[in-house]
């Protein structure tokens, strides 16, 4: 794999490329970095040109200091500017967790730039907001978002040498089949130890005003759809939704109504996968993506 930097949209973005062929951009989540996709990049890079950035604020990409610097409009522009830097007129996108919220937001604003779209566990933002506003089960599952938005988040996540992140990501994924070497774990921890990286990741939640009702006037939802009209919510791009059915953060209720907003929809389910599907089931993810991009799934 080759490592690169691009000076785009006011930041210096680190990204990795591999292979040749039709492009696929991979967008990671929180608290991740480009290496969350390492196995998929190695596999799909055999017959595609794969690109995996460290998103704004993460790992080796620069970190603006203000919360508002992580507003969705800036994140979307980062992806568009990276494509321009790479000379890509269109690309498929594969994304998970916060990367999928960004991916959907990019797709809704720039449908002409996306060939095919793969989201893991994250539903359409309109349905995501509905669930946060109206569904008590999802509201309970999303209480962590209120913690992430609070000043207490950094000490909780960074305390005892990132014990929370190690348990929530590494240990949980390993318990569900992820094969992560000690070198892999060291790379993850090194990404968290980058000064300001955890705060930058938390600022995604803060800038998006994302979460369930907070009891202090926030009705729940997010600002991810800001500036869009309802008629822009319908997606005509082919979409693959990969669902890890044991995800306790993002409930399946959010899929209700997805077919109406995404007529060209394919769903593939992994009954024993959790939130960390790309780590737990890289072979299956690569297979699903390859078949979908070939028009077979």
Feature locations, PLM:
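Flexible "cap/lid" subdomain of the alpha/beta-hydrolase fold that forms the substrate-access gate
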Residues: 1, 11-13, 23, 58-94, ...
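Active-site helix-initiating loop/hinge in glycosyltransferases
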Residues: 29, 71, 280-281
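Acidic beta-to-alpha connecting loop that harbors the catalytic carboxylate
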Residues: 20, 245-247, 272-274
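Short acidic-hydrophobic surface loop/beta-edge motif
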Residues: 4-8
């Amino acid at each position: 794999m080759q490592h690169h930097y691009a000076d785009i949209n006011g930041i210096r973005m680190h990204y990795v490329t591999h292979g040749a062929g039709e492009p696929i951009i991979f967008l990671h989540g929180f608290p991740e970095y480009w290496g969350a996709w390492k196995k998929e990049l190695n596999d799909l890079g055999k017959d595609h040109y794969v690109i995996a950035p460290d998103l704004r604020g993460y790992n080796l990409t620069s970190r603006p200091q203000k919360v508002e610097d992580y507003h969705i409009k800036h994140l979307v522009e980062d992806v568009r500017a990276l494509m321009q830097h790479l000379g890509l007129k269109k690309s498929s996108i594969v994304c998970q967790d916060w990367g999928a919220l960004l991916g959907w937001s990019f797709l809704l604003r720039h449908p002409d730039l996306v060939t095919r779209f793969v989201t893991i566990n994250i539903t359409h933002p309109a349905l995501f907001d509905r669930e946060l506003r109206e569904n008590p089960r999802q509201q309970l599952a999303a209480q962590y978002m209120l913690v992430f938005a609070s000043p207490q988040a950094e000490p909780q996540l960074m305390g005892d040498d990132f014990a929370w992140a190690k348990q929530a990501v590494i240990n949980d994924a390993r318990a569900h089949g992820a094969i992560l070497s000690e070198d892999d774990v060291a790379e993850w921890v090194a990404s968290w130890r980058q000064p300001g990286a955890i705060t930058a990741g938390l600022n995604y939640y803060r800038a998006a005003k994302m979460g369930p009702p907070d009891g202090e006037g926030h009705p729940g939802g997010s600002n991810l759809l800001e500036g869009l009209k309802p008629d822009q919510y319908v997606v005509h791009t082919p979409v693959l939704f990969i669902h890890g059915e044991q995800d306790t953060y993002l409930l399946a209720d959010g899929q209700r109504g997805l077919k109406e907003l995404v007529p060209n929809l394919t769903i593939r389910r992994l009954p024993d996968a959790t939130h960390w599907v790309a780590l737990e089931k890289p072979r299956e993810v690569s297979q699903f993506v390859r078949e979908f991009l070939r028009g077979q799934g």
